[in-house]
Amino acid sequence: MVLSELAARLNCAEYKNWVKAGHCLLLLRSCLQGFVGREVLSFHRGLLAAAPGLGPRAVCRGGSRCSPRARQFQPQCQVCAEWKREILRHHVNRNGDVHWGNCRPGRWPVDAWEVAKAFMPRGLADKQGPEECDAVALLSLINSCDHFVVDRKKVTEVIKCRNEIMHSSEMKVSSTWLRDFQMKIQNFLNEFKNIPEIVAVYSRIEQLLTSDWAVHIPEEDQRDGCECEMGTYLSESQVNEIEMQLLKEKLQEIYLQAEEQEVLPEELSNRLEVVKEFLRNNEDLRNGLTEDMQKLDSLCLHQKLDSQEPGRQTPDRKA
């Protein structure tokens, strides 16, 4: 029975905390999307006003030679070279890693979002707008682009919490951790007191983190789901959808780490096995993640075969 599996999972307080923290990140993502979308357009307009020569009439002459790869980008035309300089001028981390591989430089003169992706983490080349991004992508943009006037320490604290959620091998966090997370995410939200949709989420997050989800196995005349002591109601399917989104994001994180060989093969294998064991015990979640798991298994198998080729060595962990 699907609900009994959900009840068993949420009977573990630390797993419930993990889901609640993840739900907060989903709420944060939803309230930032519109704001970020508007600000990216404003930022792009400002760039073009300051440097009209970079506008729609500017055309990349380098073609495929102006295609970036991961953190490497050596423009082969004047337009892309000037755009790169302009982006770096506004990049807080201009001397560090910039994920140029997210971008299509030929679109920079006409597409604000292609510019925004230069300020974001790796793996976002196919994202067409803020509505397709997770919370950490939007937070990283806010943190890395000097167009956003915020206390960057507050942004990095939330990013750090998000990474701890995604990197939690057993998908569990303590109640002490959750209280600390609540303080940090609310400190961040306080930076946007003039943005109505962000202000509206503040109380929802506070209510979520201070309430206790209780899962009930319903009788015939009762509704399925979770009911908080403060009266907020989440149906079983809503809770399940939150879990699915968090697990998909976690698997995507593992995939990117595997693709860029950021962790040792044994560590990667251990992380993957923990998720597989969890899904073996939770069929309701496993069925919706089959494609994600197959994609990850295929990459890991391919890398394993590559490492076994004569003369090939497993790369050292990246710094």
Curated annotation (Swiss-Prot):
Residues recorded as bearing Omega-N-methylarginine in the entry: R61
Domain of life: Eukaryota
Phosphothreonine: residues bearing it: T314
Pfam families tied to this protein: DUF4559 (PF15112)
Keyword entries, A-Z: Methylation, Phosphoprotein
GO CC terms, sorted: mitochondrion
The keyword DNA repair is assigned to this record: no
Record field: transmembrane: none
Database matches in InterPro entries: DUF4559
Disulfide bond annotation, renumbered to this chain: none
Keyword Transport part of the UniProt annotation: no
PANTHER family: RGD1565685 PROTEIN (PTHR35083:SF1)
Name of this chain's protein: Uncharacterized protein CXorf38
Organism whose genome encodes this protein: Homo sapiens (Human)
